[in-house]
Amino acid sequence: MEQTVVRIRTLEIGSGMPKICVPVVGKTEKEILEGAERAKAAKPDLVEFRVDWYEEAADSKKVVTLLEKLRKCLGELPVLFTFRSSREGGEAALSDGKYQSLNEAAIASGFVDCVDVELFSGDAVVKAVVAAAHSNNVKVIASNHDFEKTPAAEELHARLQKMEALGADIPKIAVMPQSSKDVLTLLTVTESWKETGKTPVITMSMAGEGLISRLCGEIFGSAVTFGAAGKSSAPGQIDAEELRRILEIIHQNSNRQ
């Protein structure tokens, strides 16, 4: 099945080499802006602001003020806004209502290009965030993270299908492998999405055992991979510049006969 290419500013997600996203994390405004400078220096395709690390994440006004400063720092780089809940490996927790309103404030600010909404925040929250985003020309990544295990292939595929059905532009799944077979499960689901999904997809198997999944997206179909510029935001992330070199080698050689 031919999939949609998702355009964020001048970036095309779902065509060519996987795009590199560098997360920005930090507790204070100073740490976050310093992290943004490091991220920019790594020359990523897009930057993820992990707002759940921010000590004032529950204050939408302070978050929007910080987003304006981030936008000035990052220039034309696409910005993905993410509050990763503690239940999915993040640094903080918010009520569903607060989570929704924080995402809506970021969307309305005009300073972000894409938002991440967790599938298990509930259908109503996901639909509301998708509606707000799309009315403001902001793209949506619907996500699910399992830091303990790799669910069965059928379950992973069902979650991706639900994300697509709820209106996400890009479904995302990250899982923890307990064995190399778990990594194969994740890659098999990713590859099968090329035949059944209408959207690009982002998948990864975490930690050292899952590292290969962060590198082989062009072969199996994962459209974005995450690399670190300083502090990583998840197990298994490698340096963004090192990551780009590996992706380029695969890209240059994958079509050879």
Ranges and model annotations:
Residues 9-15:
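Short boundary motifs at domain starts and secondary-structure transition points
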Residues 104, 114, 119-257:
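Catalytic alpha/beta core domains of metabolic enzymes, predominantly
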Residues 1-7, 63, 185-186, 207-208:
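Short amphipathic alpha-helical surface micro-motifs
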Residues 2-4, 16-135, 145-149:
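Active-site beta->alpha loop and helix N-cap motifs at the rims of alpha/beta catalytic domains
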Residues 1-9, 252-257:
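Short, Lys/Arg-enriched, disordered terminal segments
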